[in-house]
């Protein structure tokens, strides 16, 4: 949508070298001149006069040849050949015209630094100059003082890239806290600065509600709202109202009362949440997506046109002309199939598979996702192309978690994620209309609410009241349990599904056989040289992983059409690769230190429970959620690339390896505790209420015919 980002491109600097031959030739020419008949040596003083420059030149050459040279910087991870520009996904390129400061390091270190623990100083040994064989013997001269030899610089201490990322995250977090608004006037000023328009009517009531609930108010926390709503400034307000009212699953708000006809359990949970703030809401209709999968993918070209209109609408209207009240709406429509009074746009719902063909139309035309060919078969081993990850990585580790979840610059993900290969259900449209949902991909156009399981606080997603013991009392390093979801896996496509890939990477037997060359990996890759893993050098990767990993499927979620059908969670086409294990309640999992979180059919509903626990979440995801702008990667959680190529490197950093690589257990504990404390401060149910109230005030303004004149300006006139 709109702008583009730059790819990190590969460049090599030529190291300038002094050539001894050229300088020696100069010395020979000088000496030959001194021997010629035109310059006979009449007196010793004359001889000294000409010999001294020769010794001076030789001394300079000797000095220069012994200087330490800059270390060469190997390019261990980046590859060239991609476009120099990084196209952004349609849903992120118009993000309020402001950068996402939460997940980006303030100054990302260049991605072409030396690999971890590698011998990369690259300095050549000094070369002693030797006189040429035809150099004439010179008369004896007084001994000249020796030229000082510069000492070779000591090899710098290797800093692990994760240390750099954590340092950057700490700074980003402090910068974020510095933006806190402590008064209503400060909050309104921050709003105008970041959004380019006046706050919506009711902003003062929103602020009062937030302060009553002890909320930390930082304008950046609400970026996702404007990311979601801004394209709708390109639609007529009347169209927005009609499309919302005419949808089949709707929450209606009239005269401060919220209601819904649907008894679908997600609808009822969202209704319960909205009813807690209904007295502060204007009239509106809220259309809901009841599916796991998102449904709106408006072409990038259309979104760009809508965003152009949105940008033109950003004005700070004179205070005297501001409309301070929302309009009243007629009673909600009754959803009768025979009622044709509501003329809504035909959505032309699509069921195209693979879903990649739908999802990528939200990417810019020049993006790799649009330009690279689409896959037609998923039967072979997945293709892992680490070079596509370089825009969001630093030395192989995620440096921009927001960009990592975008896929427009990562065309290989079409064969590495179940949602792109074969979702459980596909029903998508190109038509932009106001549909609310709990999560979405980077190119989807839903308006995000906190997911139902976050509000409902069901124990299987939260772990209950027990958030785990103290770090020092935990019983094991890594645990993951889950069902083999991600989409509809079958005999010809399961190898690319993300959960299948991750579980295989934790199979010590598979790893050992792959290391020995006995059995090539079926659906994963051994780690590349970027990570310089000590266990891999020792050919003990499988043995090492077996010491700390407790990972397995509880159900293989087999294709329902396959024959013969198996019981107990087994599956005929994956049984030779996986054995099911007993499930563990989240409260039990919190007794482990590290909790990988892998996407299922959509986002992982356990993530908020993980953040609130005393354990450390290791998060890999393609899905956007309401809270993304509130979390700082490497400060509150550990981000992981969706290929999982950095997984072993992450674990080596935290756990160490025997005596050769030190661990960072204290760093892991600090991130876990910081994440827990932060979640308890900004991801509470009260914070969900505050977020939704702000969201719905903005939504009501966009659906009002007088929207460009509406706002809250009391701070400017008082």
Report residues per predicted region.
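Short interface patches used for recognition in eukaryotic signaling and trafficking proteins
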Residues: 41-42, 169-174, 185-189, 484-488, ...
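Secretory-pathway glycan-assembly enzymes, especially type II membrane glycosyltransferases
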Residues: 45-55, 63, 115-118, 122, ...
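Acidic, Ser/Thr-rich intrinsically disordered and amphipathic helical segments
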Residues: 56-59, 183-190, 202, 497, ...
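Asparagine/serine/threonine-enriched low-complexity, disordered tracts
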Residues: 85, 95-98, 103, 108, ...
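Compositionally biased, intrinsically disordered low-complexity segments enriched
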Residues: 130-152
């Amino acid at each position: 949508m709109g702008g583009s980002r730059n790819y990190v491109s590969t460049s090599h600097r030529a190291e300038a070298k002094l050539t001894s031959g050229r300088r020696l030739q100069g010395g020979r020419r000088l000496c030959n001149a001194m021997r010629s008949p035109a310059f006979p040596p009449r007196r010793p003083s004359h001889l000294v006069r000409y010999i001294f420059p020769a010794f001076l030149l030789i001394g300079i050459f000797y000095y220069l040849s012994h200087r330490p040279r800059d270390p060469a910087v190997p390019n261990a991870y980046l590859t060239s050949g991609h476009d120099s520009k990084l196209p952004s996904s349609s849903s992120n390129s118009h993000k309020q015209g402001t950068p996402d400061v939460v997940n980006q390091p303030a100054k990302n270190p260049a991605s072409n630094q030396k690999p971890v623990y590698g011998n990369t100083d690259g300095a050549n040994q000094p070369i002693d100059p030797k006189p040429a064989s035809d150099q004439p013997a010179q008369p004896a001269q007084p001994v000249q003082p020796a030229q000082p030899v510069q000492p070779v610089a000591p090899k710098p201490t290797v800093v692990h890239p994760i240390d750099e990322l954590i340092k950057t995250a700490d700074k980003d977090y402090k910068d974020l806290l510095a933006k806190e608004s402590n008064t209503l006037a400060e909050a309104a000023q921050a709003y105008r600065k970041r959004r380019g328009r006046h706050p919506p009517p009711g902003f003062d009531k929103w602020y009062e509600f937030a302060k009553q609930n002890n909320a930390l108010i930082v304008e950046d926390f609400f970026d996702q709202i404007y990311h979601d709503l801004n394209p709708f400034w390109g639609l007529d307000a009347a169209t927005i109202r009609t499309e919302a009212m005419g949808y089949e699953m709707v929450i209606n708000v009239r005269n401060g009362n919220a209601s819904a006809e649907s008894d679908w359990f997600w609808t009822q949970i969202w209704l319960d949440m909205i009813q807690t703030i209904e007295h502060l809401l204007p009239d509106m209709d809220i259309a809901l997506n009841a599916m796991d999968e998102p449904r709106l993918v408006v072409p990038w070209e259309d979104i760009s046109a809508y965003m152009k209109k949105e940008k033109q609408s950003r004005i700070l209207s004179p205070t005297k002309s501001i409309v301070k009240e929302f309009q009243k709406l007629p009673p909600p429509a009754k959803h009768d199939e025979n009622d044709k009074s509501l003329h809504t746009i035909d959505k032309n719902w699509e069921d195209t598979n693979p879903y990649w063909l739908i999802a990528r139309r939200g990417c810019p035309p020049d993006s790799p996702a649009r330009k690279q060919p689409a896959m037609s078969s998923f039967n072979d081993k997945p293709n892992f192309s680490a070079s596509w990850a370089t825009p969001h990585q630093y030395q192989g580790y995620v440096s921009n978690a927001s960009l990592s979840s975008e896929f427009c610059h990562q065309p290989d993900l079409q064969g590495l994620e179940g949602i792109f290969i074969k979702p459980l259900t596909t029903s998508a449209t190109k038509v932009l209309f106001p549909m609310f949902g709990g999560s979405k991909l980077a190119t989807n156009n839903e308006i995000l609410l906190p997911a139902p399981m976050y509000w409902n606080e069901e124990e299987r997603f939260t772990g209950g009241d027990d958030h785990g013991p103290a770090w020092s009392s935990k019983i094991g390093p890594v645990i993951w349990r889950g069902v083999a979801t991600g989409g509809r896996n079958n005999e010809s496509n399961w190898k690319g599904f993300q959960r299948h890939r991750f579980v295989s990477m934790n199979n010590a037997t598979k790893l050992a056989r792959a290391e020995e060359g006995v059995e090539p990996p079926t659906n994963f890759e051994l780690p590349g040289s970027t990570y310089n893993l000590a266990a891999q050098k020792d050919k003990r990767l499988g043995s090492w992983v077996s010491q700390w990993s407790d990972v397995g499927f509880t159900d293989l979620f087999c294709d329902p059409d396959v024959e013969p059908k198996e019981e107990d969670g087994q599956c005929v086409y994956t049984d030779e690769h996986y054995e099911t294990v007993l499930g563990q309640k989240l409260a039990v999992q919190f007794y482990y230190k590290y909790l990988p979180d892998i996407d299922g059919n959509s986002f992982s509903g356990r993530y908020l429970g993980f953040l609130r626990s005393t354990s450390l979440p290791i998060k890999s995801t393609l899905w956007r959620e309401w809270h993304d702008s509130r979390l700082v990667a490497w400060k509150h959680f550990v981000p992981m690339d969706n290929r999982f190529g950095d997984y072993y490197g992450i674990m080596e950093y935290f756990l160490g390896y025997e005596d050769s690589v030190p661990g960072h257990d204290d760093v892991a504990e600090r991130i876990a505790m910081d994440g827990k404390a932060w979640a308890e401060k900004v991801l509470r149910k009260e914070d969900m209420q505050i977020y939704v109230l702000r969201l719905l005030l903005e939504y009501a303004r966009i659906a009002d015919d007088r929207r460009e004149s509406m706002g809250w300006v009391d701070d400017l006139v008082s």
